Amino acid sequence: MDKTLKFTESHEWVRDNGDGTVTIGISEHAQEMLGDVVFVELPELEAEIEAGESFSLVESVKAASDIYAPVTGEVVEVNEELSDSPELINEEPYEGGWIVKVKLSDPSELDNLKDAEEYLNSIEED
């Protein structure tokens, strides 16, 4: 796992792209709990997402799970690959399985997220 990633309590990850945008996906732990992903509902380009609000849906053979925005901002890119290959979320949760890229409204929101070590400790306690 990339140690520069930040995480939420609800198992989303955020990668700071260093240009005012972030990439968002779901963690290895989340995809393991979901099982085989069969469908991903992607938000619209230019949609405004708000920290703590649902912006996407991931359906697996076991369940459908809302994906919550870790930060507030504007969707600048969606991972179209997931339309044809939703299994990328299982196979490469931190690489090919990313969901959206977002232009941050407030970069300080990143400070509210857990670092990789804190996140790993929290899931070990579950």
Swiss-Prot record:
Function: The glycine cleavage system catalyzes the degradation of glycine. The H protein shuttles the methylamine group of glycine from the P protein to the T protein.
The protein's assembly and partners: The glycine cleavage system is composed of four proteins: P, T, L and H.
Designated name of the protein: Glycine cleavage system H protein
Biological classification of the source: Bacteria, Pseudomonadati, Pseudomonadota, Gammaproteobacteria, Vibrionales
Gene3D superfamilies, per database record: 2.40.50.100
GO cellular component: cytosol; glycine cleavage complex
Pfam families recorded: GCV_H (PF01597)
Gene behind the chain: gcvH
Assigned keywords, A-Z: Lipoyl
Residue positions where N6-lipoyllysine is found in the record: 62
Entry's family note: Belongs to the GcvH family.
Organism, scientific name: Vibrio vulnificus (strain YJ016)
